[in-house]
Design a protein with these regions (language model features):
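Glycine-rich phosphate-binding/catalytic subdomain of phosphoryl-transfer
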Residues: 57-173
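N-terminal glycine/serine-rich phosphate-binding loop of ATP-dependent small-molecule kinases
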Residues: 1-97, 125, 153
Length: 173
């Protein structure tokens, strides 16, 4: 029989499910993690501990509890909180904690500056949304300005989902 595994990494927990070809839940698991708040207005996750280790723990737990042969899992779907910002080096290793979506507002100054420089109308026309604490672009600008040594070591900036996909496939998406 064929199975599909789905794992979702959320703000406060990771949950996963294994379903058969008919969509019947065979096994499920969840694991809590913390949102770090190193300063007021900041929100972070530890990518290794909170994203990757949770993903592996949930996968192993679901497979063990289901008793199925892992080779019968034909697809793995992953979703994760976003949009997040995670700088990685050329080996794909995180250079800092992942900066979370709209709950992290460290780049408020950059949001204001970019909106003033580009214009709200043009941003809306090109992006379909205003720049907010949800936007990754201003967070990247904040990172460049405030962490120049880490920025120089950055090979790519990933989302939480692209970090998981890279760990699974050694590919960047």
């Amino acid at each position: 029989m064929s199975y599909t595994m789905g794992i979702d990494i959320g703000t406060y927990e990771t949950k996963g499910v294994l379903v058969d070809i008919k969509g019947i839940v065979v096994s499920e698991a969840k694991r809590k993690h913390k949102m770090l708040v190193p300063r007021p207005g900041w929100a972070e996750h530890r990518p290794e501990e909170d994203w990757w280790n949770d993903f592996c723990f949930i996968s192993k737990t679901i497979l063990k509890e289901s008793g199925i042969n892992p080779e019968d899992v034909k697809a793995v779907a992953s979703s994760a909180i976003g949009p997040c910002m995670l700088p990685v080096n050329s080996s794909g290793n995180p250079l800092m904690n992942g900066v979370l979506y709209g709950v992290d507002n460290r780049a408020e100054k950059e949001v204001r500056e970019l909106t003033a420089a580009i214009g709200e109308d043009l941003i809306l026309k090109k992006c379909g949304n205003a720049l907010t604490s949800q936007s990754v672009g201003p967070k990247i600008l904040w990172f460049k300005r405030n962490c120049p040594k880490l920025y120089e070591k950055t090979d790519k900036i990933l989302t939480s989902t692209s970090f998981i996909v890279h760990r699974l496939t050694d590919q960047y998406v």
